[in-house]
């Protein structure tokens, strides 16, 4: 059991780092954003099912709640990317991929949203991240109202909680 956390760190999506004297560990396969050249993309993951059942894929494709949640978050993330990029569009909507976990394979429903950053994006990276954070796939929608509700309900800052990494 003591080696279980170490084994998890060997996975392809594990990250570990020290930030401001604290250790942070991340196991999420969902990237907040990726940037290649000037292209910025986000891949919100909404909808998970065990791949052990024959019906899992069809359920992910047809479940009304899963479809509505994906539509809401994809629209939110598309709007967020539009604050920092041009030509933002949904490239792939609700594609299903297997994800390997320590407890076996699951099916994950994701979407891909991309746009073009300005030429000077590197000199504005902090500003860009501040406009995009917190990640809409974590907060849900409406993002601003959710953040206000959390701030009112909690007595302390969350610090490094369900954020981005890497």
Enumerate the predicted regions with their spans.
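Extended alpha-helical targeting/anchoring segments
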Residues: 1-166
């Amino acid at each position: 059991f003591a080696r279980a956390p170490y084994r998890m760190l060997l996975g392809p999506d594990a990250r570990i780092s020290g930030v401001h004297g604290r250790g942070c560990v991340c196991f999420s396969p969902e990237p907040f954003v990726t940037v290649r050249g000037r292209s910025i993309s986000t891949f919100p993951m909404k909808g998970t099912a065990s791949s052990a059942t024959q019906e899992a894929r069809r359920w992910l494709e047809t479940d009304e709640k899963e479809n509505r949640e994906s539509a809401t978050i994809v629209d939110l993330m598309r709007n967020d990317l539009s604050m920092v990029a041009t030509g933002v569009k949904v490239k792939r909507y609700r594609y299903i991929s297997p994800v390997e976990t320590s407890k076996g394979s699951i099916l994950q429903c994701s979407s891909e949203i991309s746009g073009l950053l300005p030429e000077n994006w590197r000199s504005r990276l902090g500003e860009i991240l501040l406009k995009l954070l917190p990640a809409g796939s974590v907060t849900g929608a409406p993002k601003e109202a959710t953040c206000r509700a959390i701030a009112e309900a909690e007595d302390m800052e969350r610090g490094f909680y369900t954020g981005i990494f890497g």
